[in-house]
């Protein structure tokens, strides 16, 4: 069991960031959100917390349906890593899930600051598919497909693009 191995490894090296992240992820994947939350809190308090720590924190709070705490984690993460495409993407997804359509501002900011991260293009394209402005859905969708053509999301986006082109 990964949790046992990681716990033993952390007994040998208590300050190892990678082991702590792996342990939190193991708890998260096992759906043991209480233990994952304990681990995330200690990760986020570390001075050397990286982007992945904040992503893990957001995912754990999302799983616990604590949107306000989740939002705090993303804001704290973006304060520390203001050019993190993944944090902009996931924060936008949180807002979108709560029907806050200002999420598009986060995705477009993520595209601007971290153009190599595909998730923001995907989310922005999906957002614009639901609006009257189909041009941006096509632009962002095409860029996304060029970045991530073989994934499931890439295949779904290709279908969405085809549908949008047929509407024009």
Question: Where do the model's predicted regions map?
Answer:
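TPR-repeat structural position
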Residues: 33, 67, 100-101, 134
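TPR alpha-solenoid repeat register
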Residues: 19, 53, 87, 120, ...
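TPR/TPR-like (Sel1-like) alpha-helical repeat modules
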Residues: 129-153, 159-166
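Canonical tetratricopeptide repeat
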Residues: 22-25, 39, 55-56, 90, ...
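Register position in tetratricopeptide repeats
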Residues: 29-30, 62-64, 96-98, 130-131, ...
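Short coil turns that delineate tetratricopeptide repeat
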Residues: 14, 48, 82, 115, ...
């Amino acid at each position: 069991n990964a949790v046992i191995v990681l716990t033993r490894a952390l007994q040998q090296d208590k300050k190892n960031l990678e082991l702590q992240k792996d342990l939190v992820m193991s708890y998260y994947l096992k759906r043991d959100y209480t233990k994952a939350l304990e681990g995330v809190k200690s990760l986020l308090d570390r001075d050397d917390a990286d982007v992945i720590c904040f992503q893990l924190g957001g995912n754990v709070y999302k799983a616990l349906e604590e949107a306000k705490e989740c939002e705090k984690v993303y804001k704290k993460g973006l304060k520390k890593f203001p050019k993190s495409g993944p944090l902009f993407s996931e924060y936008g997804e949180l807002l979108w899930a709560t029907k806050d359509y200002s999420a598009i501002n986060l995705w477009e900011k993520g595209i601007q600051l971290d153009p190599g991260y595909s998730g923001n293009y995907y989310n922005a394209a999906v957002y614009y598919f639901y609006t009257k402005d189909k041009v941006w859905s096509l632009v962002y969708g095409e860029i996304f497909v060029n970045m991530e053509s073989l994934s499931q999301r890439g295949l779904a986006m290709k279908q969405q693009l085809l549908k949008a082109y047929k509407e024009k």
